[in-house]
Structure formats: structure tokens, C-alpha cells
Amino acid sequence: MRFGSSCNYSYHRCVKYIEMNKKRLLYLDNLKVCLTVLVIFHHAGQAYGDGGDWAYHPNNPAEFMPWIWHFFSVNAAFFMGLFFLISGYFVPTSFDKQGVKVFVQKKLIRLGIPLLLMGGLISVLSGKPEIGHMWYIESLLVFCLIYALVRQFCKPFDGECSSKTTIISLLIFGGVMGIGSYFIRQVSPQDHWIWPFGIIPLPMEPAHYLQYVMMFVIGILARRFAWLEKMSNTTGALSLAIGCALALGIYLRDGGAWNDFVTEWFGIYESFLCVFICFGLLWLFRERGNWDSKFWQWCAAQSYGAYIFHLLLMIVLQYATDGIWMGAFGKFMFIGIITTICSFVLTWLVRLIPKAKKVL
């Protein structure tokens, strides 16, 4: 993502390079598995801390964990943005191979059907129009359809490209995102969800939505220009170090001048955290996360369905164990672990149904 030199790549050479090294892309599947588990644990903790509106609240006040908001804050800063980046990364090649008609059809099947079924079920159970965690699936579907529309009028870049990811380019990217997020949060603070114009059924949190759009777009560009493949070890390691330091800064917030500073400039602070920890994790998994065991292949195949199924399974489990004392942290870990296992296993069982794999 730097505006500088290295070896020259055209898009087709990038694709050829990537396809010759498909094993190297295992790290993206493995990273998505880890992100899915993190989402599940994030939601598991919401009932036991100040994590926003949740369908279940424990009857025992001793199960409340006041410290867990740090965990929520760090997660919210980057994990959905990283999901969008990874999703965007695979969009250009899928479109080029399938063409607009097949691309749109497959997205409507794989994203639209789960959205209608799970979103409809959540709405029925909540007694109001509500899609819960399926907002991500809906947004991803909208982004993909917009991409398909844009491609009808704009040809992809196919010239020589020597750009690569550097710390300076990440600083610029994070700065643009941060400034935009800062001004958005002046009128729409974090955790404020809306339906655009009050009627469009696309629930969004404006405070984070700019991040999601930018990360999806940067994923598309990263595929076009092989930015992930060309990211140097120095850039990757430094990005991870900066991202972890910024995450640690969230955990150190506990009143005082530092807390006041981060609170005042949180849109900018969070954006830098997002950009650096995302590219740092992408580098780390590229170098150390190409696990090719049957276990990881199995988990990767179920991770999408696990994201879809986990919420309702979790709420049922939380109500079922409400009267069982495990300690606050023990209950949080128990719910997270059991929900993760059940979600992945349920997806595996559903995928045994003929043609279900086209959706899940």
C-alpha cells in the first residue's frame, strides 16, 4: 500500500502468483476461524459486562465483570473491520472468474438466504424488526452488489504496479480513517445504531461504518496489487507491535489524564489501532498461521455457519445455566467455549444436508 518501489506486478501476474501459492492463503482461512471464535467470546461476555443491549441478563449480580469493557473496546476497534478486509480480498478474483451474473447469484444465495432465514427468526423471537449480528452479512451483501455494479462501468486496473505496504502508508490510511471517524462521532457516538433515513432496513453503527467500508475497499485493492504478499517482515512485525501497544493502551484506561485523552480522540486512536493490528495479524498469520491440518480445514469450512448460528445457541445456553454458579469469569469462559463447540458442530451437521454447502 505504499506509493513506492519493489518488484513490478500487473494484476494478472498477482493472481498467477497467488494461485501458484494457494497454500499460502490458508492463513486467511485460519485467521477467519480465530476471528469467529473471538466474536463468539465477545458476545458471550456481553451478558456479564457493560457490552450494550443483550437479550439475557444474569439474575446473580456477582456475575457482572466491570473490567471486561476493555476487552469489548479492543475487539470493537478491529475485528469486524478485519472481517470486511478479508472478505473484500476475495471479491475481485471471484468476480473475474464468475462474471457478474454468477457472482451476484452466488452472493444472493450464500449471503441473502442466511440473512432472510436467521434475520427473520430473530425478528420473530424479538417481536420487532431485528437482525442482530446478521448486520454484517447484510452489509457484506450490499458491498458485494455495489462492487458488481461499479464493475459494469469501471474496468479493473491492469497495468504495472510497484506499490507495497509500508508503515507510512498505514499511517496515512489510519489517519484518513481516524479523521473521518472523529467527525462522524460528533453527531453519532459509538454504539448508536440507526436505520438509514429511518426506513432503509440496513442497521448500521455510523461510528464504525466508515471503517468497514474502507477496510472492504482496501481488501479489494490488496488483492489487486498483492499488498499482503509483498508486505515485508519489518513492516508486518512493526505493525503488530504498534497495534498491540495501542490495544494495551485501552486496557490501561482507568480514569486520569490518559483516559481523558483517549476518550477525547478515540475515533482517531481506534482507527490507528484497527489498521496496525489488522495488518500486523495478517502478517503474523501469513508467516506463522498456514496450518494445514485436517482440524483447521474442518474449522475453516464451518466458520461461516458458526458465525450465523452462535447467537441463538448462546442465549439459550445462558438462560439454561442462569442458576448455576461458576464465578463471573468461569461462566463467561464456559459459555464461550460451549457455544463455540456447538456452533461449529451444528454447522457441520447442517452442511451434511444436500446442497446446504452452497449456502453455508
State what each model feature region is.
Residues S10-Y11, V15-L360:
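Alpha-helical transmembrane segments and their immediate juxtamembrane cytosolic regions
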